[in-house]
Design a protein with these regions (language model features):
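Flexible coil/turn and secondary-structure edge motifs
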Residues: 1-216
C-alpha cells in the first residue's frame, strides 16, 4: 500500500498507485469562456475536423489553462490529469501523490492560425521547467513539467526542449527537467476546475516563468 506520508516529490510505482474507478468525471457541456461544446460523442474532448490537440503540464492547471485559452487560434481548453497510473482519478487523490498523475491542460487548436511550435513557445516561457517535481511554491509530482505528444509532435517538442535548454543555460539557469513522452490517457478534472480563473478572477495562480525568452 502506498504510504501517504512519503515524499510527495517521489513518483509512486504502478503497484502502489490507487486503484481508481471505471466511471469518468462529468464535465460541463460547454467551455465557460468561449461557449464551444466541450465533448465529442464518445465523451472525449471535442476536436473539429482539421484541428489538432496538444497536452501540457506546467504546474497548477488553473493558470496553465488561462495561458492557452487566451491565444488566437485556440478553440478549446480543458484541465485534467495524465501520465500516472490511476484510472479516472479525483483531485484529492492526485494531490496525495498516490496516482502518479500530473495536472495538465489539453489544448484544441487550429493549425492554420496557431502552430504547435507557437504553443510550445508559450509553454516554455510560462513556467520554470528546471524545478523537477514542483513549480514555484507548489510541490509534488502533480506539478512536474511535461509535454505529452500526439501524432508527429514528439520530435518538434524534443527540438524545442534542446533550444530552450541552451537559452536557459546561457542565462545562468539549470538544466530542463521536463518529461516529453507520447500522450497518455487524458482524464478530465472536476467541473469546478474547468476554466477556474475565468469563474474566479482573483483565484490563486502560482504560474511564473524564468524571464528567458524562447529563441526565435
Amino acid at each position: 500500500m502506498f504510504n501517504r506520508m512519503m515524499d510527495k516529490k517521489t513518483m509512486v510505482s504502478a503497484a502502489d498507485a490507487l486503484a481508481g474507478r471505471s466511471t469518468s468525471i462529468a464535465v460541463p457541456a460547454e467551455h465557460y469562456v468561449n461557449h464551444h461544446a466541450m465533448l465529442n460523442d464518445a465523451g472525449g474532448i471535442a476536436v473539429p475536423e482539421g484541428y489538432k490537440k496538444a497536452l501540457f503540464g506546467l504546474g497548477c492547471f488553473w493558470g496553465a489553462e488561462r495561458k492557452f485559452w487566451q491565444l488566437d487560434g485556440v478553440y478549446l481548453t480543458a484541465v485534467g490529469y495524465a501520465a500516472g497510473y490511476t484510472p479516472n482519478p479525483g483531485y484529492e487523490e492526485v494531490c496525495s501523490g498516490a496516482t502518479g498523475h500530473n495536472e495538465v491542460v489539453i489544448v484544441v487548436f487550429d493549425p492554420a492560425v496557431i502552430s504547435y511550435a507557437d504553443l510550445l513557445k508559450v509553454f516554455w516561457e510560462s513556467h520554470n521547467p528546471t524545478q523537477g517535481m514542483q513549480q514555484g511554491n507548489d510541490s509534488g509530482t502533480q506539478y512536474r513539467s511535461g509535454i505529452y505528444c500526439y501524432d508527429n509532435q514528439l520530435s518538434i517538442a524534443e527540438a524545442s526542449k534542446q533550444a530552450y535548454n541552451q537559452a536557459l543555460l546561457d542565462g545562468g539557469h539549470r538544466e530542463i527537467t521536463t518529461e516529453i513522452i507520447d500522450a497518455p490517457v487524458f482524464y478530465f478534472a472536476e467541473s469546478y476546475h474547468q476554466q477556474y480563473l475565468a469563474k474566479n478572477p482573483g483565484g490563486y495562480c502560482g504560474l511564473g516563468g524564468t524571464s528567458v525568452c524562447y529563441p526565435e
